Amino acid sequence: MRRRKAPVRPVLPDPVYGSKVLTKFINAVMLDGKKSTAQKVMYSALERIESKTGEKGIEVFNKAMDNIKPVMEVKSRRVGGATYQVPIEVRPARQQSLGIRWIVEAARKRNERTMMERLSNELMDAATEKGSAFKKKEDTYKMAEANKAFAHYRW
């Protein structure tokens, strides 16, 4: 284990919308350090959302993020030879990073032609509480509910 807690590095807000969450999302979409490509994909996905829904792209994005953030998750805990799935609350920073990760993973697995289309469709689905990223959140919550009996093993 590390001696000290790692300092949280500051994140600059993105140049178009001024959102720090969007910057983190762009960084998650980025492959091989190609940030400008990731920005193009993300901004064109948000524009596509605007043309499809008529709402502002950033508002749909924020709504999707709020819908995907998990409140509870399970952690494995070994107690005398048995491994229990112990439900725990998720810290806000982890909620955000899990939400981002789940949306990007779900978008990459979709069958649309371009990443921009996949991402915009996944964000629209997440905003309306559909899609595989939302399903992942629901499954995580169900696991936590099912293992509520082991909540006293929390540490």
Swiss-Prot record:
It comes from Sulfurovum sp. (strain NBC37-1). One of its GO terms (molecular function) is rRNA binding. HAMAP family: Ribosomal_uS7_B. Part of the 30S ribosomal subunit. Contacts proteins S9 and S11. The keyword Chaperone does not apply. InterPro entries: Ribosomal_uS7, Ribosomal_uS7_bac/org-type, Ribosomal_uS7_CS, Ribosomal_uS7_dom, Ribosomal_uS7_dom_sf. GO terms for biological process: translation. One of the primary rRNA binding proteins, it binds directly to 16S rRNA where it nucleates assembly of the head domain of the 30S subunit. Is located at the subunit interface close to the decoding center, probably blocks exit of the E-site tRNA. Belongs to the universal ribosomal protein uS7 family. The keyword rRNA-binding applies. Keywords: Ribonucleoprotein, Ribosomal protein, RNA-binding, rRNA-binding, tRNA-binding. GO terms for cellular component: small ribosomal subunit. This is Small ribosomal subunit protein uS7.
